[in-house]
Amino acid sequence: MLFNAVHNSLPPNIDIDHAILRGEDHPPTCAKCVARVRISALGSLDLRYHSLRCYAAPPDVGRCEFVPPRRRVLIANQGLDVSRLPPTGTVTLLLADVEESTHLWQMCPEDMATAIAHLDHTVSEAITNHGGVQPVKRYEGDSFVAAFTRASDAAACALDLQRTSLAPIRLRIGLHTGEVQLRDELYVGPTINRTARLRDLAHGGQVVLSAATGDLVTGRLPADAWLVDLGRHPLRGLPRPEWVMQLCHPDIREKFPPLRTAKSSPTSILPAQFTTFVGRRAQIS
């Protein structure tokens, strides 16, 4: 098998289909994987798949990260760093913006200019430290987007951002996991749209997650962090409501007003003030 040829060893419980070697311009087929498999194609066309690395990954890792041949030609010609390219396949997106950004710019433009410069540095450092990729420096206005192959890394990054002093800025952060599409190295499609709508529900200082992301990070949260079930809420312009969770930690604010939505579907078993705690058995006991 390919892994054996490259690394002189065979990872347990993984059977990689030999179709990987065909150089096709779509993600390779992976069969009989006990864990999800992350595939990274590195190097130039001369190396082809010699530097392809296949390895078992924890369950919160996206299904597949694959650089097709035509894109590798562009990478080689432009001298780009493959590790900093936006991941594709199943990823967790972090989308954040500055609460009341327009008002802050009007009231204290000089302070905001300094704060935004500090924010840019803080965001870039946090994303890099947690293995994420920022496709563009700015997404819309004072918002930004980052992509992570591990949902737990996205949650840790969001937590670090909220724990950092950014005054007078307060960030609203939304996390969602799903299939993504790239167009001119920018994410488009339903996954980023849903992430943006989740972020719009949040208040400054708050991190909200979709049910998909919440499932992936349960049991893999940073130390002392936990999730709170906020119930199911409609998302503006989207047909399907979302079950929303909040990422909490002793170092950040926990109590917020109701989410920024016109109405909530009364599907939670308990009232909002008695929401379900997830991943906090030790503190509760």
UniProtKB/Swiss-Prot annotation:
Annotated signal peptide: none
The cysteines covalently paired via disulfide bonds are: none
CDD domains (UniProt xref): CHD
In this chain the Guanylate cyclase domain maps to 92-199
Extract one GO molecular function annotation from the record: adenylate cyclase activity
Q: Which family does it belong to?
A: Belongs to the adenylyl cyclase class-4/guanylyl cyclase family.
The name under which this protein is listed is Uncharacterized protein Rv0891c
Q: Which organism is it from?
A: Mycobacterium tuberculosis (strain ATCC 25618 / H37Rv)
